[in-house]
């Protein structure tokens, strides 16, 4: 067998070993080279054109370019009944042995089961065709797969299970099949059907134990070594699917059981966490060049990667790092016992640490498939995708590099639209490319970082213009309004300051002496949004069946009214600007929109579930119609492609609209009922509100222009705008972060009474207190602990009401004589407080 090696880049280890075609007697060098990507790590490699396979020098997997055709014998498949029969025979023999013989001969007794596995693991096809589900929407019968692993795990000997893992590793290392260009193997699964065997391997139950270094029966050094090898290759293969196969994978993931789906998300996230911990332990080492991959030998002989080898040491690789990082504080630590490299307290992962780390990149790509599936069919909260280790990434540099890579990619595509050659960059991967890994708090930090830069830039430009023109130019966006005309005054002020919307916002209420340090701004947002949702404006409608708000349907004659001062178009534009300013100025709004509203802002595709959330009764009736398949369908429903809706100002007036050309004369039949439902949803979620939503969108993105907004999904945007959706206030957590001034402390009687009263309040009353103190009745998306809550002492006036400084989230309490007096004064203050003035 002949080999060929070639350096692609002299700076690193971009060399590949080309394995000659086994059918060729000799290897003829060819000067014509082509590029192919590794089907495991995704590295782009250059190789001679006339070879059938080569070995990747990064992950050491053999990439097959021209696979061998195999025929599948059904008798070679894994069959649980056959395995149980073999197991029963082995158990009978095992039970007849005495205690000493059981210990000495257990491997021999269960050798039949080991042989059964070995004969079916020569190629990928027996495993690939096993455990089929009767459900056409599922790729695997997960109950059968679970039973298969249970049989192997519960054997008196671990050897059959270990042999299975070794065989899996060999198949992953040398699949003998061209996985880069898969061909359909089953009409049911199409292209993705060739990867079923990898999905079965990913169900191995000890993977999480390996990553977390948990105590378990199969958590010996050899098991950890082989299971890690299997896992990293399996993750790599599933992350490097071609576009068509990836779409098919996402389709099947949408129908996966929720508990299995959540388990996969957890596994891949643990895999990413493991490799960040590994990077931490290799900082400052020559092997940490971004492409080093620990092999079997590393696990078997390294105390660092395999801590159990040093039984006297209390340091466990992953366990230790989880304690360090997940505790929220990075403590100084050394990467090994004899290392002189000590990490700083404020250590952050640099993009150079992980930017070319293929394990993290492939893990993130696989998690992306799961995330996309979750966006279409909600399986788990988006917070399940957050990786806490990512909180210790240098997010500012990652964000800047992400923007640079995006510009470089766009420039490359524009200049080399006809070129298919690979593009090289010092850092090929940033966390911002997979923003679902960032926690919401980190995304808000990135948004605030970019917002602060834009605001400072706008203020700087205003100052420079003032110097050039010798004029006074305000560095703030100042809006001066009257309470009774808050919408009109705000619209006029915004129209006159279109170029200043990215400046820091300052609000002034006419005839009120308050100085805006944050509180007036919150009050303005609250009053303005409340006025915009007034039914008299006709901008939004209340949907009784869901108790949510939605854009009013614009009648055709009103398109003429979409122009001019105070028109619907201008008010929608104003609402968009207000929403953008609220995000820019970190202010929470009380909005009652469905998830579809935030999906449309983020450009996400709407689904049937979005329609059901907004119109649950209508949607349920539609689904019942779709289920009915009787011959008398048209007689029972008697529908046409037409809909009707009330006028937004006069509900007694009804408007009719056709869902398609000549819809009023086209009957809904069994054949076209699905198209009818699709057009119905499209009308109410898109077409009917298009003019108003487009005006809103223009206003919103006139303010929100930065790239950081692209990091947020619809669920996160809703939390960013409206705060946490929790239906209770965690009083103990709020108390733990509260600061005291003026002589109060946590043990002061008045303070203790205050917390007792707050705990006894119902949630609506608690929200009123939050609004009284902070200017908003919603808890921030990042939790109640991020509210800088303060309680101050006022020594005189024990018969007066409590005061608040919403600018500073501060409540001022007098020295009340008892708890009931404080309770009564608080209730009066909460019910009757509005406006700003001297007290």
From Swiss-Prot:
Reactions the enzyme catalyzes: S-ubiquitinyl-[E2 ubiquitin-conjugating enzyme]-L-cysteine + [acceptor protein]-L-lysine = [E2 ubiquitin-conjugating enzyme]-L-cysteine + N(6)-ubiquitinyl-[acceptor protein]-L-lysine
UniProt-recorded Gene Ontology molecular function terms: ubiquitin protein ligase activity
Superkingdom of origin: Eukaryota
Keywords: Nucleus, Transferase, Ubl conjugation pathway
Gene Ontology process terms (BP): protein polyubiquitination
Enzyme class label: transferase
GO CC annotations, alphabetized: TRAMP complex
Main location: nucleus
Transferase recorded as keyword: yes
Entry's localization field: Nucleus
Coiled coil regions, renumbered to chain: none
The EC number(s) this enzyme carries: 2.3.2.26
InterPro entries: E3A/B/C-like, HECT_dom, Hect_E3_ubiquitin_ligase
RNA-binding as UniProt keyword: no
Domain HECT: 497-839
Residues annotated as catalytic: 807
Family matches, as SMART domains: HECTc
One Pfam family, short name: HECT
Self-association and partners: Component of the TRAMP complex.
PANTHER family per the UniProt record, alphabetical: HECT-TYPE E3 UBIQUITIN TRANSFERASE, UBIQUITIN-PROTEIN LIGASE E3C
Function text: Probable E3 ubiquitin-protein ligase, component of the TRAMP complex which has a poly(A) RNA polymerase activity and is involved in a post-transcriptional quality control mechanism limiting inappropriate expression of genetic information. Polyadenylation is required for the degradative activity of the exosome on several of its nuclear RNA substrates.
Similarity field: Belongs to the HUL4 family.
Protein name listed in UniProt: Probable E3 ubiquitin-protein ligase HUL4
Organism: Eremothecium gossypii (strain ATCC 10895 / CBS 109.51 / FGSC 9923 / NRRL Y-1056) (Yeast)
Encoding gene per record: HUL4
